[in-house]
Amino acid sequence: MAVKIRLKRMGAKKTPFYRVVVADSRSPRDGRFIEEIGTYNPVAQPAEVKIDEEAALKWLGNGAKPSDTVRNLFSNQGIMEKFHLSKQGK
C-alpha cells in the first residue's frame, strides 16, 4: 500500500480550508484517510498552518511520500530539515 501525505479539501465554495491527512494513494482526494496530522487555512492572512510534528516525522520515517504542496508546508515549518537530519543520524 503506497501511502501519501496530502491535503483534503474542506470548507465552503470559494473559501478553501484543508486538512493534512495520511491516505492510501489510490483513495480519492476527499475520501478515506488513515490519520489527520494537521490543518492549513490559505484564506487567513497570513496563512495558518498547524501540523503535528511528531506524527509527520513518524509517517515520513515509515515511507509516506508528501505531495508537492505538503512538502512546501513541511519545509516552511522545518519538518523536512528535521527529517533529513534524522535520516543522516544527527
Swiss-Prot record:
PANTHER family, alphabetized: 30S RIBOSOMAL PROTEIN S16, SMALL RIBOSOMAL SUBUNIT PROTEIN BS16M
GO annotation terms (biological process): translation
SUPFAM superfamilies per record: Ribosomal protein S16
Keyword entries, A-Z: Ribonucleoprotein, Ribosomal protein
Family the UniProt entry places it in: Belongs to the bacterial ribosomal protein bS16 family.
GO CC annotations on file: cytoplasm; small ribosomal subunit
An example molecular function term from Gene Ontology annotations: structural constituent of ribosome
Protein name: Small ribosomal subunit protein bS16
